[in-house]
Amino acid sequence: MELDACIKGRRSVRAYTDEPVSKEQMEAVLEAGTWAPTGMGREPWQFIIIKDKNLIKLVSDETKQLVKQAMPPLAERFSTDVDIICYNAPTLVLVCTEKDPQWANVNLLDSVLATENMFLKAYELGLGTCYMGFVQLLNNKPEVLRNLGVPENLEMTVPFIIGHPKSKQGRGERQKPNVLKWIK
């Protein structure tokens, strides 16, 4: 697949089949992440792959509760039995880095760069992905992180779901680049 087609075709997927992501597919996706640019060549990312449906449900349930507490205007939307966090995806990936205040911003950016590589590779393989920003609220719930296998010295930087899309995603329109000014 051409890079331009991959970049423009990838969409956030929120509906998945029950078909599992194979180990080979997941390894290819993770390897793509390790080829991302990284500050000072540190490659700070570590990955936790969760396929256990009960743990994924725990993540969804705990995250919904935290969103309702942290953002009252969203409380009604998050008071549902429908999984509007992990969307019943078969796999949840936690990109984690060490808790290090000096490197926190760099670690976050490195994790985001690695994740974009993984998203593009997943799309190339016919898989769908979606960034789960609200799941980061679980960084304030050490008991949940322990259940997910996140060591105490690490924090989640980018959680995302991955699986086989239920349907083909439509192409959305994007705005033209918003260039403030060209400086010559």
PLM regions: where:
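N-terminal amphipathic, basic helical "cap/leader" segment at the start of enzyme domains
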Residues: M1-N88, I183-K184
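A generic structural signal for short coil/turn motifs at secondary-structure boundaries
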Residues: Y16, Q102-V106, Q169
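Short, electropositive alpha-helical surface patch
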Residues: V144-E155
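Small-aliphatic-rich amphipathic alpha-helix that forms the alpha element of a beta-alpha
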Residues: G33, V93, K99-V144
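Short, well-ordered beta-strand micro-motif
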Residues: I49-K51, L94, I161
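C-terminal helix-cap and adjacent tail motif
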Residues: A5-S12, E155-K184
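Structural motif
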Residues: P90-L92, T129, E155-T157
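Short, basic/glycine-rich phosphate-binding loops at helix/coil junctions
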Residues: C6, P90-T97
